[in-house]
From Swiss-Prot:
Domain Josephin: 36-214
A single MF term (Gene Ontology): cysteine-type deubiquitinase activity
Transmembrane stretches, start-end: none
Enzyme Commission numbers on file: 3.4.19.12
Organism: Drosophila melanogaster (Fruit fly)
Region (Disordered): 1-37
Annotated Low complexity bias: 9-20
UniProt xrefs under InterPro entries: JOSD1/2 (IPR040053), Josephin (IPR006155)
Protein name: Josephin-like protein
Lineage per the UniProt record: Eukaryota, Metazoa, Ecdysozoa, Arthropoda, Hexapoda
Top-level enzyme category: hydrolase
Domain of life: Eukaryota
UniProt keywords, alphabetically: Hydrolase, Protease, Ubl conjugation pathway
One biological process term in Gene Ontology: protein deubiquitination
């Protein structure tokens, strides 16, 4: 499912020279690249993987900003200090509630996919994109692992006829190949401690929401 025209990036280029807008008003996308094949890619800054995943999913630097996601945190739980939906030091680390609420503001919804199922049941033609939530090992510097884990958000999408991993930790988007290759990639991810969310465009799917259009007909309840 291709992006609606309002959600595509035009000819603007990201700034690849800085570390993001430190005043919290920008998207925090200091490490951004427009790839030669026209794919927009934000790279990791601080713990803003949720922000980068959303902007990479929608292919634009201004779809969401750090300040906007911070506002969503206080909308969901009206307090700034020790807000449960983000890092207490204000570096991001947004939880699933913020990601789902952000998608709703763009007329999309996130559907959790049961990882016990085979992803070959998915009706890829009606799915706008995918968000993966994966474990992330924390370390002190590059060498000393810390005894706790965090979670990392990343986006997956079909662009220019192929599926791509738009993980902000990658130097550039990674082509995952054809539909069949992508489904095999998802199957591998789901065998690990990874959570998959399907992103659906409510503007086109609202009439058939109860019919589980994200599944092929033979797999619907």
């Amino acid at each position: 499912m291709e992006s609606p025209s309002a959600r595509t990036l035009g000819n603007s280029l990201g700034d690849d020279s800085g570390n993001g807008n430190e005043n919290g008003n920008g998207s925090g996308n200091g490490n951004t690249t427009m790839m030669p094949h026209g794919i927009y890619h934000e790279r990791q800054t601080r713990h803003l993987c949720g922000l980068h995943a959303l902007n990479n999913l929608f292919q634009g630097p201004d779809m969401f900003s750090k300040s906007e996601l911070d506002d969503y945190c206080t909308t969901l739980t009206p307090r700034n200090w020790l807000n449960p939906h983000r890092s207490w030091i204000g570096w991001g680390n947004y939880d699933v509630n913020v990601i789902m609420y952000a998608l709703q503001q763009r007329n999309c919804e996130a559907v959790w996919f049961d990882r016990r199922r085979d992803p070959h049941c998915l009706n890829l033609s009606v799915i706008f994109g995918f968000i993966l939530n994966v474990p992330a090992q924390m370390s002190l510097g590059y060498y000393i692992p810390l005894p706790f884990h965090m979670r990392h958000w990343l986006a997956l999408r079909r662009l220019n006829g192929s599926y791509y991993n738009l993980d902000s930790k990658l130097r550039e988007p990674k082509c995952l190949g054809t539909e069949q290759q992508f489904l095999e990639f998802l199957a591998t991810q789901l065998q690990m401690d990874h959570e998959l969310f399907l992103v659906l465009d409510e503007e086109t799917d609202c009439k058939d929401k109860s019919q589980q259009r994200w599944l092929l007909p033979q797999f619907r309840d």
